[in-house]
Design a protein with these regions (language model features):
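Short amphipathic alpha-helical segments
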Residues: 12, 38, 233, 237, ...
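Conserved PLP-enzyme active-site core in the AAT-like
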Residues: 40-265
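Structural motif
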Residues: 35, 86, 266, 315-316
Length: 362
């Protein structure tokens, strides 16, 4: 009976390594606590976390509204992969244009997606205002907070319903459920709110509230597709969490010194970091980021793409890597790497120029 109750979701606990294990469980509890959520789900990568979130919220023929200033891999997932494999479409909007998010919402829209600090320019979006728009239309706000971490901002406090972090960065591949979204009242997510045939007719919204969202992903999507985080990597992430605040504090402090230096350099056209008063989103920096604006930002060197690449090739301390948030400082040319799937027009539309260089300060 004990085993039957576990498999029937009537009793919470470990069943099988693909779904959870004790080490992952501790990691998930700590992440949920850091973000102020009710539960979390750790998976094998940030890409899996994003993909699982979208697949849990939208089905074939449905739609997602997203900021256009996001990581190139997520942009490609929404623009090409999900339409081709799942029939889920997306509309990308200018987050700085007034009314853009609400204007893009359709009858079949199932979520709004933003990043706390956009990749690669670290632009800010008014989380609180976008959350109000999402809830007005009975859909959740999903926030990728990889660049910020809960040390800098906790999106759930400003109305976000689901928070995602990417693996290999400050924290790890994880989905956090705020527990605040009313899946039953929305009426837009019957696979969560109504009897689910995959579990003999239980309603996740009733049987597993307030953690219905991550329980649905764990019990259905993770169970059937298996992008599982290993216990060893969960252990490593737990070690990292012990020093998260200290590390991010030092990252931010070092980044501000580089931002100040580049802002005054004659060979630099522009620097994009939310702490700068010249940035359009600086007023949001004051509202959301009292502990600093992160350590990942871009600048535009005077010249063209070849100038940028020559500059990168001649750096002695920085490592040329697509990752961010490492203890060592990293550099990349976004237009030809992290956002290389985008067309030239899409790159410019996202604020990425041929001479844009992204830095991640260690």
């Amino acid at each position: 009976q004990h085993a039957a109750d576990r498999f029937g979701l009537r009793d919470a606990g470990n069943i099988y390594g693909r779904l959870t294990n004790p080490t992952e469980d501790v990691f998930e509890q700590r992440i949920a606590a850091l973000e102020g959520g009710v539960a979390a789900l750790a998976v094998a990568s940030g890409a899996a976390a994003i993909n699982y979130t979208f697949q849990a919220l939208a089905k074939t023929g449905e739609h997602i509204v997203a900021s256009k200033t996001i990581y190139g891999g997520t942009y490609n997932l929404l623009a090409h992969t999900l339409p081709q494999t799942s029939g889920i479409t997306a509309t990308f909007v200018d987050p700085d244009a007034e009314g853009s998010f609400e204007a893009a919402i359709q009858e079949n829209t199932k979520a709004i997606f933003i990043e706390t600090l956009g990749n690669p320019n670290s632009n800010l979006i008014d989380i609180e205002e976008v959350a109000k728009i999402a809830h007005k239309h009975n859909i959740p706000l999903v926030v990728d907070s990889t660049f910020a971490t809960p040390y800098l901002v906790r999106p759930i406090e400003y109305g976000a319903d689901i928070v995602v972090h990417s693996a290999t960065k400050f924290i790890g591949g994880v989905i956090v459920d705020s527990g605040n979204f009313d899946w039953k009242a929305s009426g837009k997510f019957p696979w969560i709110s109504e009897p689910n045939p995959s579990y003999h007719g239980i309603s996740f919204a009733e049987a597993t509230a307030p953690a219905a969202f991550v329980t649905y992903i764990r019990a259905i999507i993770l169970r059937d597709t298996g992008a599982t985080l290993s216990p060893f990597h969960a252990f490593l992430f737990l070690q990292g969490l012990e020093t998260l605040s200290l590390r991010v504090e030092r990252h931010v402090s070092n980044a501000l010194k580089i931002v100040d230096y580049l802002s005054k350099h004659p060979q630099v056209e522009a620097v994009h970091h939310p702490s700068l008063e010249s940035e359009p989103s600086h007023y949001l920096y004051k509202k959301y980021l009292p502990n600093g604006g992160g350590s990942i930002f871009t600048f535009e060197i005077k010249g063209d793409a070849q100038t940028a690449q020559k500059f990168i090739d001649n750096l002695a301390i920085f490592s040329l890597l697509a990752n961010v948030a490492d203890v060592k400082s990293l550099v990349i040319h976004p237009a030809t790497t992290t956002h290389s799937q985008c067309t030239e027009e899409e790159l410019l539309d996202q604020g990425i120029k041929p001479n844009t260089i992204r830095l991640s300060i260690g």
